[in-house]
Amino acid sequence: MTNLNYQQTHFVMSAPDIRHLPSDTGIEVAFAGRSNAGKSSALNTLTNQKSLARTSKTPGRTQLINLFEVADGKRLVDLPGYGYAEVPEEMKRKWQRALGEYLEKRQSLQGLVVLMDIRHPLKDLDQQMIEWAVDSNIAVLVLLTKTDKLASGARKAQLNMVREAVLAFNGDVQVETFSSLKKQGVDKLRQKLDTWFSEMQPVEETQDGE
């Protein structure tokens, strides 16, 4: 298994939908989560870069699909945050369409990291993301974020509860805890990404360039 240097991750581009993404080759691992789940902070912690992914004081600001390259043909994808109450309904529907289309049609997408605030896990849209991934045979890592907000006993109870709940999806779904503030869980995230990038088959360029 190759240990990648995530500190070398760099921004490639932003796209409003799947049609504006670069060619569907290599391996992509996407990060998804509700608007306040700590997704940008997790990406910045993983790469040890303070502003690789912009953290916004206004949840729901990230409306684009953001691509980052870790190494040649190996990309991380920051998907639009979902579920923020103050975003207009039409925009919510647009985001959900873009998310669904990306998850269903992007061949190079081979792993999905779903981030959830450990205090409020498995909301409807979180479950929908996991269902989409499992239905598309995409491996899932659930990261329960902001673990520093709970005492040790409550953390373990939440972790066990979510691990039990995801069994119902009947897919490749692993659950771990994560804290950007305490740098807890970063090693497990890196190990999972290394495994995915090393063991999964990259998508090759086709003759017609599709």
From Swiss-Prot:
Natural source organism: Escherichia coli O6:K15:H31 (strain 536 / UPEC)
Cofactor(s) listed in the protein's UniProt record: Mg(2+)
GO cellular component, one term: cytosol
Residues annotated to bind GTP: 33-40, 60-64, 78-81, 145-148, 178-180
Protein name: Probable GTP-binding protein EngB
GO biological process annotation, one example: division septum assembly
InterPro entries from the UniProt entry: G_ENGB_dom, GTP-bd, GTP-bd_ribosome_bio_YsxC, P-loop_NTPase
Keywords: Cell cycle, Cell division, GTP-binding, Magnesium, Metal-binding, Nucleotide-binding, Septation
Function: Necessary for normal cell division and for the maintenance of normal septation.
Keyword Aminoacyl-tRNA synthetase attached: no
SUPFAM superfamilies named among the record's database cross-references: P-loop containing nucleoside triphosphate hydrolases
Pfam families: MMR_HSR1 (PF01926)
Annotated PROSITE patterns: G_ENGB (PS51706)
Binding site for Mg(2+): 40, 62
Organism domain of life: Bacteria
Family, as annotated: Belongs to the TRAFAC class TrmE-Era-EngA-EngB-Septin-like GTPase superfamily. EngB GTPase family.
